[in-house]
Amino acid sequence: MSGVGGESVHLRRSSTTATTTGSSKSSLNISKSVSPTGNKAVSPMSSPNSLQSGATPTIAQLQSLLKQQQQPNHSITTNNNNNKSVSVEIDDLKSQLQHSNINDTFNEDEEIEEVTDEVIINHDYHSSEDEYEDDEDEDENNNSVNNNSNNNSNNNNNNNTSISSAHSCESIAEEEELTASPILSRQYSYTIGHGTKPDVVLSIGGGFHSSPRSNRSESTIVHEDDLTNQNDKVINAKDKISSDYKRMMEDPEAFRNEKLKQRKSKFFTKKDLEEIPFNPSSGTQLRSTLFQQFMNEKIQMISENPEKYKSELMKFYKQNLKPQVPKSPQSSGSLSTHSDKLKTSSSLQRSRSVSQPPVVTGNSKNAIGSLDTILEKERKRDGNQDRQLPILFTKCVDFLSNDEALKTEGLFRVAGNSSEVEDLMKSILLYGSDIPSNCCYHVVSNMLKKFLRQLSTPVFTFKYHNDFIQTMKLNNDEERIKAIKEILKLIPPVNQLLIKELMKFLVKVTSFSNVNMMHAHNLGLMFGPNMLKAPSDSEMNAISMLDAGNQVITLLIENYNLFYDN
């Protein structure tokens, strides 16, 4: 019977199953069945006064009335405490039954089951559900019960009323399972393989075994990836790092030796390390060659004339070990002159652009001599009187004339290693050494610029410095070319030949300007300040001198055929 909280009450007896639910109308559904032994149930006595219109009769009263309805006299006798009997006619009974809304139809398809005397309250049953589904094993028992009830209904006459139940109950085991486990809402979309516990178990062979559909959600996405393997790799890497760190903190020296041993044995065996030849860098080769030549020269001098070498060595020590006393200014005039020179040099350094190379004047302490002096020394040393250009210049031009060097981006602009430039320059000037084949192109190009910059007399000479500046003030290039031609005829022959060969080489460099990014103007910026210099710092205008030198070199490169048409 139905309670206030929407609960369903199932009354179970040995021969009858009744279920009532609360609704706007009081209704009663009774399913009559035959007991397993085939005997009819005994009806207890009930009071007819309780069967009034609108009242709900009890099951015992209704069974008693139906029992007496089947008797021949068609009357029902009720005994009370005062032993009074009341005879109720069958018509009155039918009218009372109609007012009680009793369904007197028997549905053969309804399921009738035999249960014990037990009342089960199902809190999880909802009125919106039509009925519970029965198991297959319960269907067999219900079929046997229905057959017995059909046989019983055939024996009875038309007055036999079959009462059915609209809601049949399930087995006790099923109801206990429903009441014990609450209804849990499942996740609609379940993604496997991204940090959640999957419903699909991945197998080793690459396939997967799905769990039952009831245990999964409506939409399950299976990602067959190797996240497990990746997580294992990460964990292993973390463990290795932590173990290495621990060993490093415990014994740093042993850890270092172990890593060095692994590094050496990773690529080469011990035998390979012994057989691999040593390939020093170009700078190392230059230093070793220079030192070897120096030692050979000293050994030769000692063997030829030991006394002379000893006297020269003592003279050298006396000069360098002699203390130098700073000279004090003799007068205020000399002091003012010295201060003016300092101001001029400082103003020049401030006005000089960072991107432009520094200007080295003829008073530089690093001067290596003029072209004539260098060429004369080389002729005596090598015994070649036909040499017309310094060997350093010819070696640099020959080394940079191949296509690979000419395609080097930033040639003459990118700086090279200063120590390698210095060592290579000394080796060539003193001993005429060759340039190593693996030498950097930027080292050689910077050495050529440094050679031109450290000449005691610049290539365009101090004497004609102002003349070159004045030619660049002319109106057009034709006049400038004509004036420069006349000036070039006045400078020494060695300088003329060097300018011609250098401009010829720079024209070749500009032919690869789309690769090396060195146009005529860029080359003018690199060589102008090194070849056109003022006689002294006090007599030069830095801006005009730099612009004039750049313009002269650019004009020579762009109009090489006009200058040297022969």
From Swiss-Prot:
Regions of compositional bias (Low complexity) in chain numbering: 14-35, 65-83, 142-160, 345-356
Keyword ATP-binding on entry: no
Biased composition (Polar residues): 36-56, 327-337
Chain positions covered by the region annotation Disordered: 1-56, 65-84, 128-168, 322-366
Bias (Acidic residues) ranges: 130-141
GO biological process: chemotaxis to cAMP; small GTPase-mediated signal transduction; sorocarp development
PROSITE patterns assigned to the protein according to its UniProt record, in alphabetical order: RHOGAP (PS50238)
Rho-GAP domain boundaries: 369-564
InterPro entries, sorted: Rho-GAP, Rho_GTPase_activation_prot, RhoGAP_dom
Pfam families named in the record: RhoGAP
GO cellular component: cytoplasm; plasma membrane
UniProt site positions, description: Arginine finger: 413
Keywords of this entry: Cytoplasm, GTPase activation
GO MF entry, a single one: GTPase activator activity
PANTHER family found in the cross-reference section: RHO GTPASE-ACTIVATING PROTEIN GACH, RHO/RAC/CDC GTPASE-ACTIVATING PROTEIN
Function comment: Rho GTPase-activating protein involved in the signal transduction pathway.
Name of the protein in its database record: Rho GTPase-activating protein gacH
Gene that this sequence comes from: gacH
